From Swiss-Prot:
Family annotation (InterPro entries): Thiol_cytolys_C (IPR035390), Thiol_cytolys_C_sf (IPR038700), Thiol_cytolysin (IPR001869), Thiol_cytolysin_ab_sf (IPR036363), Thiol_cytolysin_sf (IPR036359)
Motif (Cholesterol binding): 515-516
Family of the protein in this entry: Belongs to the cholesterol-dependent cytolysin family.
Protein name: Listeriolysin O
Organism expressing this protein natively: Listeria monocytogenes serotype 4b (strain CLIP80459)
GO molecular function: cholesterol binding; toxin activity
Length: 529
């Protein structure tokens, strides 16, 4: 379904990216989905000559970092909630509906090669930054190493740039120098190539998850979701009670990626005066191995929260249709869900104003939000929205492994119903109508109460009508009627004996005819699914 959603969005919002690029090393196992540019990293600038002391320091740094003993698969791990007790099933009356809430234990395991960026930490995020691969990086608060830096080469993947115009060497790779270099690359493209490429379509990256717990969504979208949810305000309480269904969507429009050269040896990323002892004093060790930000995606990030109080099992399908723009005119239930749902959007980037936008609206307006920022130009500048890190030891991708257990809550509404009785036969009739009402004890076990109509086995003459109102938890409905024939050998004759009928909004039971030829009908108006 997710692939289908991506196709819908891509066809409607954007054209295919102009510049197709060669594939980089395989990161598909980490679901990067074109987030980070696949163009080959630029070559490192030539190393400047070192004095014997500087060479000694560089060799010691290389030996120390390359000798760090750690399992790259266990360095960056997020452990979310552990579920030990699953709340029992329960039911409750809500207006003209009976709601049954069920809970199941679920788990999520997600490998993320890219780390989301929100404004709170964007100042720490720049291509080539040296960071410690530890819990702070997992928590999206990278611990940047404050050391002198050597030169590095940046490249950008905007289309049309030739003759090395897409590359730039930063001689002293400080944060300000790197950011200035990125701005230089972007401005170079705007001045020399933008006219030839007036509509550079953003690359689309889309992911979604029905919401059940914060820990689950952090495992899905990364720890940046904590900050995002301060604005989204996912209603976990109402979701847990079965009163609300909400979905969170991460929608990225990536304008360009800036990549960093892979160092041929770890010491190439450090200034000549940096020593192994300095790195050790800064806490670089096997528990905190060094890594670097190898690629940064710039663009527009939209986080969406879709909300509805519907108990329908088709809510996810309705949300998917609203996002993709797929017509649901032929489906009344989906149409009603979309009509009675809302969204909240938190938007980073895509505006000349350096601010976070928060927008509330109806699902019918959602398409306008997603269409904005579909192309890159001066009026829709990109901001850092995600970055990838590599271990400095061997340039291997540093992948964050997220896992969490959570309680999936589902609810189903059973609408109250009614039995309409109409007796117009030429005879005395007696009815016997019964049903079961289902409730749940504190342990979630079913409690079945058998109910009978108060007018059962009472003689009724024509013309007799009545309505029996049944609650939404009524099941196994039985309708029986007999008529008095006046015959000594068959005083009572069965007219209708329908058993284990389902609850419907309106069930019409009619009996008519004569003592010897009684008739009946059992029809349904507006059946309840």
């Amino acid at each position: 379904m997710k692939k289908i959603m991506l196709v819908f969005i891509t066809l409607i919002l954007v054209s295919l990216p102009i510049a197709q690029q060669t594939e980089a090393k395989d990161a598909s196992a980490f679901h990067k989905e074109n987030l980070i540019s696949s163009m080959a990293p630029p070559a490192s600038p030539p190393a400047s000559p070192k004095t014997p002391i500087e060479k000694k320091h560089a060799d010691e740094i290389d030996k120390y970092i390359q000798g760090l003993d750690y399992n790259k698969n266990n360095v960056l791990v997020y452990h979310g909630d552990a579920v030990t007790n699953v709340p029992p099933r329960k039911g409750y009356k809500d207006g003209n509906e009976y709601i049954v809430v069920e809970k199941k234990k679920k788990s999520i395991n997600q490998n993320n090669a890219d780390i989301q960026v929100v404004n709170a930490i964007s100042s720490l995020t720049y291509p080539g930054a040296l960071v410690k691969a530890n819990s702070e990086l997992v928590e999206n608060q990278p611990d940047v190493l404050p050391v002198k830096r050597d030169s590095l080469t940046l490249s950008i993947d905007l289309p049309g740039m030739t003759n090395q115009d897409n590359k730039i060497v930063v001689k002293n790779a400080t944060k300000s120098n790197v950011n200035n270099a990125v701005n230089t690359l972007v401005e170079r493209w705007n001045e020399k190539y933008a006219q030839a490429y007036p509509n550079v379509s953003a690359k689309i990256d889309y992911d979604d998850e029905m919401a059940y717990s914060e820990s689950q969504l952090i495992a899905k979208f990364g720890t940046a979701f904590k900050a995002v949810n301060n604005s989204l305000n996912v209603n976990f309480g109402a979701i847990s009670e079965g009163k609300m269904q909400e979905e969170v969507i991460s929608f990225k429009q990536i304008y360009y990626n800036v990549n960093v050269n892979e160092p041929t040896r770890p010491s190439r990323f450090f200034g000549k005066a940096v020593t192994k002892e300095q790195l050790q004093a800064l806490g670089v060790n096997a528990e905190n191995p060094p890594a670097y930000i190898s690629s940064v995606a710039y663009g527009r990030q939209v986080y969406l929260k879709l909300s509805t109080n519907s108990h329908s099992t088709k809510v996810k399908a309705a949300f998917d249709a609203a996002v993709s723009g797929k017509s649901v005119s032929g489906d009344v239930e989906l149409t009603n869900i979309i009509k009675n749902s809302s969204f909240k959007a938190v938007i980073y980037g895509g505006s000349a104003k350096d601010e976070v936008q928060i927008i509330d609206g109806n699902l019918g307006d959602l398409r306008d939000i997603l269409k904005k920022g579909a192309t890159f130009n001066r009026e829709t500048p990109g901001v850092p929205i995600a970055y990838t890190t590599n271990f400095l030891k061997d340039n291997e991708l540093a992948v964050i492994k997220n896992n969490s257990e959570y309680i999936e809550t589902t609810s189903k509404a059973y609408t109250d119903g009614k039995i309409n009785i109409d007796h117009s036969g030429g005879y005395v009739a007696q009815f016997n109508i019964s049903w079961d009402e289902i409730n749940y004890d504190p342990e979630g076990n079913e409690i079945v109460q058998h109910k009978n109509w108060s007018e059962n086995n009472k003689s009724k003459l024509a013309h007799f009508t009545s309505s029996i109102y049944l609650p939404g938890n009524a099941r196994n409905i039985n309708v029986y009627a007999k008529e008095c024939t006046g015959l000594a050998w068959e005083w009572w004759r069965t007219v209708i004996d329908d058993r284990n009928l389902p609850l419907v909004k309106n069930r019409n039971i009619s009996i008519w005819g004569t003592t010897l030829y009684p008739k009946y009908s059992n029809s349904v108006d507006n059946p309840i699914e």
